[in-house]
Amino acid sequence: MTCFNRKEKTVKSLNGLIQGNPEIQFSFVVADDGSTDGTSEALQEFAGVTIVSGDGNLFYSGGMRLAIAKAKESIESYDYCLLFNDDVDFYPLAIEKLCKKENGIIWVGPTSDEKGQLSYGGVRKISSWRPKTEIIMADSKEGTACDTFNANCVLIPWETFIKLDNIDPVYTHSMGDFDYGYSASRSGAVIKVSDQFVGVCPDNPVSVSWRNIELSRKERLRRKENPKGLPGKEWFHYLKKNYNVLTAIIYSAIPYMRIIMKK
């Protein structure tokens, strides 16, 4: 897990996992990206937490890379590695239920928004050449196969986790989890999404993103190139790696066209 200045959410998330899954013995690796709100001090109150510190410039992908690298240094062997976000309000027994599903598979735990609608989960490609995907959850206990995932809650068998490469260093914030999942699929790992929500995690509103057409072109461009937006170099790399060069050339230009045309 990675965190930055969300002490209450971070503490609540860890407490939810520990208290809600009494049959599981957790060991946490948390990348704290230079929080100034007492997050690091609060984390030290938990048993079994290893903290790796950043300087405030890690963002999501950088923080997760640091945490994953630290976890792989462990001399102990675990059953699973759980990737999760600290803004997930986990339901009781959510992770225990995932652990009881089919072995040897990467299981994605879908989340809902506050209205009970799917917010994050498994991700399936709609096209082999267009970067169009859909977020899905299963409709049966057997789960549904997917191509990648939102890493808000992902349970990876330890042996699989150790073999996987870390998150690509090109990514600062967004796209890192999608790319990580695609890499896992290419390595031969099977990814399935569960049929039960593991908790609540509202998705990010369009109003704060570069896609908000009410913003000026200048502001939209600034937000797009921000690490939390869709930086051009990272987006091109993502498209080339997970689709092809032609797709990367065409679709890396489209966001700029949308901004110019106010769409």
Describe every region a protein language model picked out.
Residues 206-263:
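Non-catalytic, C-terminal membrane-associated alpha-helical segments of glycosyltransferases
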Residues 149, 154-165, 170-197:
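A short, conserved alpha-helix in the catalytic core of glycosyltransferases
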Residues 76-89:
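Short beta-strand-to-loop acidic/aromatic patch adjacent to the donor-nucleotide binding site
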Residues 15-25:
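Short, acidic, metal-binding catalytic loop of nucleotide-sugar glycosyltransferases
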Residues 16, 32-41:
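A conserved acidic beta->alpha catalytic loop
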Residues 54-73:
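Glycine-rich, basic loop-to-helix element that forms the pyrophosphate-binding segment
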Residues 89-124:
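Conserved donor NDP-sugar-binding/catalytic core segment of glycosyltransferases
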Residues 135-156, 222-223:
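A recurrent flexible, glycine/aromatic-enriched loop bordering the glycosyltransferase active site
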